[in-house]
Amino acid sequence: MTQAYYRKTPQQALEAQNASAEGLSAQEARRRAEQYGPNKLSEGKKKSTLQVFLEQFKDLMVLILIIAAVISAFSGNVESTIVIFAVLVLNAILGTVQYEKAEKSLESLKAMASPTAKVMRGGVRVEIPSADVVPGDIVLLEAGDMVVADGRVLENFSLKVNESSLTGESEGVDKTAEAIDADQVALGDLKNMVFSGSLVTYGRATVLVTGTGMDTELGKIAALMNQTQQRKTPLQQSLDSFSAKLAMVIMAICAVVFALSIFRTGMGILDSLMFAVALAVAAIPEALSSIVTIVLAMGTQKMARQNAIMKDLKAVESPGSVSVICSDKTGTLTQNKMTPQKVYADGSLLEGEDLSLVNDVQRLLLKAALLASDATNNEKEGTAIGDPTEVALVMLGEKFGVDEESYRAQHPRLGELAFDSDRKLMSTLHDIDGVPTLFTKGAIDVLLNRSTHLLTREGKVEMTPERREELARVNMELSMEGLRVLAFAYKELDAVRPLTLEDENGFTFIGLISMIDPPRPEAVQAVADAKRGGIRTIMITGDHKVTASAIARQLGIFRDGDEAVSGVELDGMTDTELDERLPHISVYARVSPEHKIRIVNAWQRRGNIVSMTGDGVNDAPALKKADIGVAMGITGTEVSKDAASMILADDNFATIVKAVVNGRSVYANIKNAIQFLLSGNTAGIFCVLYASLLALPVPFQPVHLLFINLLTDSLPAIAIGMEPARKGLLDQKPRDPREPILNRPLLARIGGQGLLIAIVTMIAFYLGYQGGDAVMASTMAFATLTLARLFHGFNCRGSESIFRLKLSTNKYSVLAFLAGVVLLLLVLFTPGLKSLFMVAPAFGFANLGEIVLLAFLPTLVIQLVKLVCDARRGK
């Protein structure tokens, strides 16, 4: 609807809606309410809590465990079944709770709607619920009102609207009633339209409603939110791939063992099946799902302490693999407040702080800036109130101890010509030393054409073409730096009288004041750190291309050879053309929510893990579409927070870099935990296969494997997950998301380490089997495998030797080892537990000494190999 109305005149717009300035009749309003429905945002289809809970069991590893648990139950091994199901249900509950907290986007969008609206109905002004507004209604807007529907401005009285929640830009937008004759106009340039969810900050207007509910720009965003599908996180993708491959390997091994048990050892089918199930339980890292959840939860807590709040546990490691950050400008990379910068007066271009109140021209420039504005300073709260541009002028006065209130008290306003987007001027009349003086601020091109003189320290001089050219040159120079420039002039009147537009001529030009929404100081370093870590930062903004490029250059985002593209230019590109130019585009200006999703999609097509940061409603769909959406916690709308995976509590772009380091650390710790669990399980598989091939007694009882996998292993694995971040993580490039979590080097380490542990375990088995005592052999193998895996926890802390890492850097690894040893000793020497865990009655401390020596051998070998590797790397 918007595109059809901005080109029409007010009268044509009324005719198109079959409406009049008197408003709709009550009967017609009811008819249209039935036709168009309530002025509300529709809700997306939601999953029930039960659906969410059941979806937690779709993971392949979980399904395999369920099958193993069911077979165990039918085979009489009830204890294993109960423990496995308890672990799976706990994981499902945790996943459901996280999901329920994250899905609230549409509720926040609905809450943004104003509860009431002032409309004309049958020539009478009435106030109605915003849900009852229909297309064709005449809405009356004034300062402080929330716009409740999209509409065409019919009458404009200096209306200024803050559309930052839609466009992302904090500067108020001046509205007009004039038609716009253009084929394609960006949302931020539709000066004769107002949009649902925006706020009126100044003036008033009469508006014809052209769109309600889902037919508004806000509704389009809600629709995008419903349609946008979130991709799985890199960790989810890696674990899915890992689970599928591990399942195939386990099923193949179990099939081989099942066959060997029948044909090699002569075991019955049921016994062989139970043995194969026991092997499956030994092979599957039952604790992995719980440990990954715990490691992610601990990562979440650490990030929260660093002001990065993660909503989805599975996304905690995602920042570590991000290769592209698509960042909103206003409030994210910049401070979201206009700040005075350079001043031009008396032929000199100065920094704002270099302004001299001794200089008559500069003093008059400051006086004009404070008098010809309406912003005020709130001393109690330490903030200024008003239009952001005028707030910057108040800030300039503060730098020199000049209070705008005292200025205005000394020189009260005697008359005013309010700002108008057509004139691009604002004028106020004051008494200056007994002389009625008109101060005017506005666009330099307008004021230059209306100025006949220029003020210098010598007095007024004629405004010659050369002087106009010089002022225009300075303005262009400031604009190219991304600065917004305001011009100031004055005119002395003969007497105090009502002002007319004719008075805005014959000015004496005073000077220029420029301002900017400055970059956050920490954002500059954060962008540089991101680049060092192999991460590309892209600026996406609703601002003008020149301004955005200048800010991006200051931040280090935009470099020589880079491109800046507007939303209109982006519309003219095919996906193929965009893909070709994508690596060179660093700035996207005047973009819509659809553009943002298209940009994210383009980078994802190239195999990148994409992060999108933002704080406005307009960012929400792209935040949800991105691999990881980052919302601002202070300035961000509830919509953006609910759509994002991560919220920055301090709105600090630099916090993202900390999240990257933490994400990489979390992924490394999960990978190390997987190495620990699988190498230990591999050792158990090697032992069982060896025993099957040689027709030896079963080396482990099912209760042994359950003890190792669910109790002893979990403690060191959790400790590995608490390993502090290594130095130099930010110097590494983002990992390839296509790389499996189990790559060849890791598989080789798992296989080699598992073989070492299996060898010492089977040596212990033979030591116990010397007298043909199968129970003693099983006890020796069980105790050795358990202790060897406890020692192995130190090997899996990282790639460096523990002699370089130092045990003190992770006290939890020591505590986990000691706790595991205590549990093992209790099982081996406590009478009641000995019988429960089928420990040989003859097992004593002499046997324990043999076990300790054997169990430590794999760790000794692995640490010696690491020392050699460290020496070769020059560490």
Protein language model regions, located:
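Conserved cytosolic headpiece of P-type ATPases
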Residues: 1-731, 741-742, 755, 766, ...
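Alpha-helix capping/termination and helix-coil
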Residues: 607, 664, 759-771, 788-798
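Generic alpha-helical transmembrane segments
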Residues: 712, 757, 779-793
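Membrane-water interface at loop-to-transmembrane-helix junctions
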Residues: 736-755, 775-779
